[in-house]
Amino acid sequence: ARLTALSGLDRAFFCNSGTEAMEAALKFARRYWHTLGERRTRIVALEESFHGRTIGALSMTSDEHYRAPFEPLLGGVTWVPIDNPAALEAAVTADTLAIVAEPIQGEGGVRPLSPAFAAAINQ
């Protein structure tokens, strides 16, 4: 209850790793749209991101170095540059399942999202 009060959210889900968190997020997004009767399949992720080593997490990772040995991965992922709201808006369609973004990227260097780009993601 304290965690949700601090975050402004109504639920929390604990994971052992970032990979588990990404897999859970993917499943939550699919379940959400399924519950609404929609089958959305597209994922928008940020370039130079790394989300883990499971098939789902690797599918959302842009670096071919990590992806190539495990292909074919999940399809339907579009990568956009960090801090480019126009590219983000162009990538999001009626079929978008989720937007995957780290508040602070670590794979491409320690790069926090700008407040304006974070706000664009929330839109």
Range-by-range predicted roles:
Residues 123:
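Active-site loop/helix belt of alpha/beta enzymes
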Residues 1-38, 42:
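Glycine-rich loop-to-alpha-helix module at the N-terminal edge of alpha/beta enzyme cores
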Residues 47-105, 109-120:
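PLP-dependent aminotransferase-class I/II
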